[in-house]
């Protein structure tokens, strides 16, 4: 089903779907600019044009839950109406994610040979006290052995799992998996988080809260301690892919008096906020 509506109306549902409406106003405005930029760029690229659509309503693009607009987020959308992030007059990929591990990454985490010129890796201590800034989970050895068979088609017993490569910001970009019938490498942020999915396990957050694991490891920022034949313990930090703006970081920055523009300039490199034609 295709739902056709004005971009600004769409954003009034996207922003509260992506960021809690209780966050600070300047953080909400930064989120609105990022969300508008992201949608604007997808519209330009026309990836879903064959379906008569500009974006879908999933995390593949931006979460659009068709919920009732919230006053705070709607105000953030209206106060930034038409504003997008650009570099050299062209809209950028304004990525954002939930919580940092203390540093952000570039798109090299997805295999880019050179980072996009508007993305940079920055220290981010603003969200260091957030529950997801540090976490730990334990995955049974037999679970990973089964996953190696299902995802990679590997056969035989699992012998070892280890980090083989990290990027400049410390994210794991290569995971070496050894089996009795051969070895293989898991690469890129998403595939690594999927292979090490903590589904069926508990995750302990920094504040001691325990939550059920999901389809993806919280982030690719982790250390691994293997107990062959028993389990692997993953100790990491952050929630999400880690590229672009940290949403909880933006909220804490706003609490400290940073403006929307200052927040965006912190997370992105050599950008300007421009007004679209409508």
PLM ranges: what are they?
Residues 1-278:
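Conserved, single-site charged/polar hotspot
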């Amino acid at each position: 089903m295709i739902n056709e509506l004005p971009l600004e109306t769409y954003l009034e549902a996207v922003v509260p779907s992506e960021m809690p409406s209780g966050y600070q106003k300047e953080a909400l405005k930064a989120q609105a600019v990022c969300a508008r930029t992201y949608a604007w760029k997808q519209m330009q690229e026309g990836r879903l044009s064959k379906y008569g659509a500009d974006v879908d309503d999933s995390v593949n693009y931006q979460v659009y839950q068709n919920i009732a607009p919230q006053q705070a987020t709607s105000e953030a959308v209206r106060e930034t109406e038409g504003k997008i992030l650009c570099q050299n007059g062209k809209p950028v990929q304004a990525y954002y994610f939930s919580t940092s591990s203390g540093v952000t990454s570039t798109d090299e985490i997805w295999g880019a040979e050179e980072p996009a010129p508007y993305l940079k890796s920055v220290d981010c201590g603003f969200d260091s006290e957030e529950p997801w800034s540090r976490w730990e989970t334990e995955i049974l050895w037999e679970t990973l052995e089964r996953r190696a068979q299902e995802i990679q088609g590997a056969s035989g017993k699992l012998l070892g799992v280890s980090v083989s490569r990290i990027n400049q910001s410390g994210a794991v970009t290569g995971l070496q998996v050894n089996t009795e019938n051969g070895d293989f490498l898991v690469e890129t942020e998403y595939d690594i988080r999927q292979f090490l999915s903590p589904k069926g396990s508990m995750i302990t957050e920094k504040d001691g809260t325990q939550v059920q694991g999901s389809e993806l490891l919280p982030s690719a920022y982790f250390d691994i301690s293997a107990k062959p034949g028993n389990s692997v313990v993953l100790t990491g930090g952050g929630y999400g892919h880690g590229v672009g703006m940290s949403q909880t970081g933006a909220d804490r920055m706003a609490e400290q008096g940073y403006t929307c523009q200052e927040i965006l300039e912190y997370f992105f490199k050599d950008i300007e906020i421009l007004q679209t034609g409508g």
